[in-house]
Amino acid sequence: MKLLGVLITIYCIASTLAIDVNVPSNGMADLNPVVNDGKSETEWTITTSANCHILLSCAVKGEESCDDVSIVTKDGDKERKLCPMATNSFTVQDFINEKVYVKIMTTGKDYKASCKAYSITNPKQPNQA
């Protein structure tokens, strides 16, 4: 029985991956999830420079439900979820914060989802030097 508990713990750890990504000013990072035969989640904490904001471009391919594949983004207290529809889903999200959380969940190799994170320099305001 003790061995079964160890195996379950190892499986749970192996199916979730957390990654910290620092996108340099005016840079870009690909967010491609680790995909297994079963359910897997890849989580990113994306940060950028103080004078920048983050722009995400995400896509979910397929006609499955949110139970099969999804992308969740969190910017402060605001959370959004992108799921497949009758056709492929695509979204672009612009975040004010310098830190964004992204999680991609898949339940098999047939489900496709990915994002690109861009760091955009904030434009100077008219009263700034």
Swiss-Prot record:
Cellular location(s): Secreted
Disulfide bonds: 66-83
Tissues in which the protein is found: Expressed by the venom gland.
Domain CUB: 19-121
Broad class of where this protein is predominantly found: secreted
Signal peptide: 1-18
PTM annotation: Contains 2 disulfide bonds.
GO cellular component, one term: extracellular region
Keywords: Disulfide bond, Secreted, Signal
Similarity comment: Belongs to the venom CUB family.
Name of the protein described by the UniProt record: Venom CUB domain-containing protein 1
Taxonomic classification: Eukaryota, Metazoa, Ecdysozoa, Arthropoda, Hexapoda
